[in-house]
From Swiss-Prot:
Name of the protein in its database record: FAD-dependent monooxygenase nscC
Species whose genome carries this gene: Arthroderma benhamiae (strain ATCC MYA-4681 / CBS 112371)
Cofactor(s) for this UniProt protein: FAD
Family recorded in the similarity comment: Belongs to the paxM FAD-dependent monooxygenase family.
EC code: 1.-.-.-
A GO term, aspect molecular function: monooxygenase activity
UniProt pathway annotation: Secondary metabolite biosynthesis
Secretion signal span: 1-21
Gene name in the database record: nscC
Lineage start: Eukaryota, Fungi, Dikarya, Ascomycota, Pezizomycotina
Keywords assigned: FAD, Flavoprotein, Glycoprotein, Monooxygenase, Oxidoreductase, Signal
Length: 412
């Protein structure tokens, strides 16, 4: 029973949960990951990893080389690519480059990563297999720090010394422990589509515009249309697109923040009509139109942010819960830093646990919570505010984009 009590229970097998589990496992600290979904769940879209996030992970995994990450997660890894992006913002009605950094001499610092591949790569970065138990949907938490119990809907009960909430923006753990913390809905419309092309069609329709970049970002008059490579092989290319814009008044029929999950997979006729009025340039024009979109898998995404105060974090810690990832710092996907801070959360929390365990032989859980939040709280909450502000700036009027572009040209 004593050994079981020292086990750390991780709720959620996303990036943050798996990072924490992998680092704990590599250091011989017992832990179990519980995931509500089945092993075949898919989150195959791509995210941007920045140096501050992946460098900390590589170091914590034993100073793995940058090339190991690229070979494991880059969307174009199967054709020898490196997940490179040009970081350019283009006028999606003309194709003109509005803003672009000078990348001629700089080293690659941003890596585009397939989310599924990243999860698998993290899970595989060690000799011992992670203990991930799927089909475990959390029902409630009992106990306090040092002696907690997780109760699941399948009637399973597990005891441990600490619960790590890695269960996302709609965290079940957070809703029980901190019911006052409710995700803030951002008043923006966001639709996401997925489709595939033969490699030959990709080379003809998209490659002339994107060249070697794994994402082609188009910005318009208060709306965005990024095209992104999710996975690419010698014969097939899996891509996705996003269409996001600011809300137009109180009766905007496309603004549906509380749409049921099944309805969120249906394509509203109003979206098809709106896409056909955008007057897009190629390559966006070929894919973001009513006829093409009908053949894609389309999802309505509600953009939400989560803020947690230091007092809330301390209160949760007293009840045996520590937060990582979107459960406590959800931020916008486009222009956000969420995946990077999820990695940092896992690295920093694991380090706090490992340090405490090595110093005392068993975890001093009060110190673990204190030391983790001592740095992670400000870092992550600042990132939520910064990412939200950036998200709105990326939906600015076309006139402002033109002004920015002209100023860049004058400086150059």
């Amino acid at each position: 029973m004593g050994k079981q009590q020292e086990t750390i229970l991780i709720i959620g097998a996303g990036i943050a949960g798996l990072t924490t589990s992998r680092l704990l496992t590599n250091n011989g600290i017992p832990n179990v990951v519980f995931e509500a979904s089945t092993p075949d769940r898919s989150q195959g879209f791509a995210i941007s990893l920045q140096e501050f996030g992946y460098s900390a992970l590589l170091a914590a995994l034993g100073d793995l080389p940058f090339s190991s990450l690229i070979r494991g997660v880059a969307p174009d890894r199967q054709i020898g690519g490196s997940g490179w992006i040009d970081q350019a913002l283009r006028d999606n009605r003309t194709g003109e480059v509005l803003v672009a950094p000078d990348l001629t001499t700089a080293k690659q610092t941003i890596v585009r990563a397939n989310r599924n591949a990243l999860r698998h790569w993290i899970a595989d970065c060690g000799e011992d297999e992670l203990d991930v138990r799927y089909g475990h949907k959390l029902q409630r938490i009992e106990g306090r720090l040092g002696d907690v119990t997780a109760v699941f809907e399948n009637n399973a009960r597990y005891k441990g010394s600490l619960i790590i909430a890695a269960d996302g923006v709609n965290s079940t753990v957070r809703s029980q422990i901190l019911p006052n913390v409710v995700p803030e809905t951002i008043p923006l419309i966001h639709y996401h589509g997925e489709f595939q092309l033969p490699h030959s069609a990709f080379d003809e329709l998209i490659r002339p515009h994107s060249r070697q970049s794994n994402i082609l970002v188009g910005v318009g008059d208060r709306f965005n249309t990024p095209l992104s490579i999710c996975n690419i092989t010698k014969s097939q290319v899996h891509l996705d697109w996003s269409y996001s814009r600011t809300v137009k008044g109180e009766n905007d029929i496309l603004y549906r923040p509380n749409v049921p999950s099944e309805e969120a997979k249906q394509i509203p006729p109003a979206l098809l009509e709106e896409l056909d009025t955008l007057c897009l340039a190629e390559p966006w024009k070929s894919f973001l139109n009513s006829e093409s979109v009908k053949t894609h898998r389309v999802f309505h995404w509600t953009t939400r942010c989560v803020y947690i105060t230091q007092d809330d974090a301390r209160h949760a810690g007293e009840q045996g819960v520590v937060f990582v990832g979107d459960s406590w710092h959800a931020m916008p996907i486009f222009g956000g830093e969420g995946g990077n801070h999820a990695l940092l959360d896992g690295v920093e929390l694991a380090d706090a646990i490992i340090t405490s365990t090595s110093n005392s032989g068993k975890g001093s859980w009060d110190n673990v919570v204190k030391n983790y939040y001592g740095g992670a709280w400000k870092r992550s909450q600042d990132a939520v505010r910064r990412s939200t502000q950036r998200f709105f700036l990326l939906h600015r009027p076309a006139t402002e984009w033109k002004e920015i572009s002209e100023k860049k040209k004058q400086i150059a």
